[in-house]
From Swiss-Prot:
Residues 37-48, 237-255 have a biased composition (Polar residues). GO terms for molecular function: DNA-binding transcription factor activity, RNA polymerase II-specific; DNA-binding transcription factor binding; RNA polymerase II cis-regulatory region sequence-specific DNA binding. Belongs to the NK-2 homeobox family. This is Homeobox protein vnd. The gene is vnd. It is found in: Nucleus. Residues 298-307, 703-716 have a biased composition (Basic residues). SUPFAM superfamilies: Homeodomain-like (SSF46689). Residues 1-115, 224-307, 465-549, 703-723 are annotated as: Disordered. Residues 10-22, 61-92, 226-235, 278-289 have a biased composition (Basic and acidic residues). Residues 545-604 bind DNA. Residues 23-36, 97-111, 483-493 have a biased composition (Low complexity).
Amino acid sequence: MTTSASLERTPSKRDRDRERDNSSGLGSAGSLPASPQSAITVSPSSPATPKRPLRTSTPSLERKREREDREDREDRKERQERHERDRDHERFAAVFSTASTTVPTNTSSSSGLAPEQLRIPTGAAAFSGFPGLHSMSSLMLPSSAAVAAAAAAPFLPWSPILLPPWNHALLPAAFYPAALRNALPGLFDAKVPSSQRSGFHISDILNLEGSELKNAAAAAAAAAHHGSDLSHHSASESTSGHRGQGSHTSPSALSPTPAGVSADEHHNGSGTGGGAGEADHHSTTEHHAPPSHPQQQHPHHQQHHHPHLLLPQQHHQQAVAPLPLAHHQSGEAQSHAHANAAAAHLLASHNAAAAAAVAAGQYLPNLPKNFPGSFGDEMSSYHHMAQTMLQHSGRSAWIKENELYGTQQPASPDSTSPVTSEVSYTYIGSNCQTSPALSGDYKSYSRSADSDALSVGDALHTLHGSSGNGSAGGAPTAHALHNNNNNTTNNNNHSLKAEGINGAGSGHDDSLNEDGIEEDIDDVDDADGSGGGDANGSDGLPNKKRKRRVLFTKAQTYELERRFRQQRYLSAPEREHLASLIRLTPTQVKIWFQNHRYKTKRAQNEKGYEGHPGLLHGHATHPHHPSALPSPRRVAVPVLVRNGKPCLGDSSKLGADCVSVSSATATAMQNAAAHHLVALNGAAAYQHAAAAAAGLHAHAHAHAHAHGHGHPHAHAQRAAWWP
């Protein structure tokens, strides 16, 4: 009976053994598992029963096998529960840990020892007794003081997935530590155990030399007995993560951001993450040079990385696709790059916002001395912020307004003051408060950089690309803006001379009036970048004479014309008073009056308007001004045309779409006189004034001059200006 029962149970038992051997790969508690990691984590107290050949003849052997099966299942359950407990413990502890660690991304099959899988630069010798690591997540911690730092190790590469808010909130803090200190006061100093601080605080980022060298020395002492592992580690550190060769994530010894994030996400994932990952990578590669000779790979790899890192960093506002650096990656690196890509885009936008906020605030980041070398050029970080501000509409308006209004001369300096005479006098009327018409639109002052460099927007744009010929010191302060502004104006004076004299020949925008003067000025190369210039313009530098056209705003021209209609000659006190009202110099007012008298006289002689006192100043008068009305002694009647048909006859026979000749005479004559002078002077100075004349200018002045005066050449010249 026993034999038959055992024979009935034999097939099911045999199937169960076969399934167990095929599926689990773990075997009994004492047999060799599939991976060396799981072999290490097996409890040493578990029984080790060797496998015997399968025999089904005796029930005692079957009972032994059943007992072994139960023990195997219990061991598997225990290991699984231990995995779960350790994983949960690591997730909670890693949130409060900022210690820099070295984490295995793929455990090598040749070695399963703990010191080669986990290294902490400060006090690493304390962790030499680790039993082992199991698939990046099983830690058995011998010391409660090291819990926060050690438990974070396997968690760091997963941080973009598990804790996105922490990841993106902490990463910009490496570049702007002051913002983080204000937002999270005392977080890092309070959460890190006292035994793990070793003199590091978040403020040490501002001065990396002393404290990071101390930690680098500690790391060298701790890593002295890890020769082979250090070579892998240094190679991975300088090549942004050889993820597939059992190497480790770069430990940034002083970064408050998680080390796995700073190296893997910034280099593999984004390539656009602002300055944090780049600064961490280069600072660690520089300061870890003392430990051993494999670090000599760093200069090559740094040089190799610059074209990849600096290119997207200058234009990081657009969410650039991740750069997977294929020549440095192998194995798991591709998958990690794809896993970090989504987080990288969020990070880039967050860093852009942080840069704009910092630049628009009251402080600039106090960059450490080793940043220029790692960024590649001295103004890179400041260009980063300036370019960011120009991409945000609210910020660009703010910087233009403050730069425009902050650099004006409080008094009325001489016209021979250096470069700032252009910046201060040309657009200064928009800040004058003497009349409602003086509130100009400073946002539209940006003009083409090749025609002139007066507008603040162009000065800021050229600041981003002209650190070589721009600022002398390249210091990232507010003076760098002004220095580049002045030097850019100096560098473009040749184009000012060539194109600015033509006035309206190059299309300017409507907020500017193209009336102006050409004056002999002392063009001084302002090399000190002070942005000032005293009243006499003598700062000890050699001067050279140059003709330059100074353009006036509409408000300044309007005030000059109004005064010219009242009084054609001004005394010296009157000139000074008028100049102080419209923020010009007395010399500029005098030259403008001289030029205006000459223009009106020449217009009288050439066009035969000697008997028209109202038209003497016609081209400078607003069309609706009372003094703009022509004299009734000599009137040229305009012929109005609508849809190709002349509107003739008395007012009772006029069509609905025709306008009476008598009501349109004054405006038409005003426009006609204005456009004769426009054609003669070769400048479209008063298009905006004539365009305001109730829509009558196009047909009225054309036929008035074509039929009434018979000037075909003037009509042909007007055709170029009026469609």
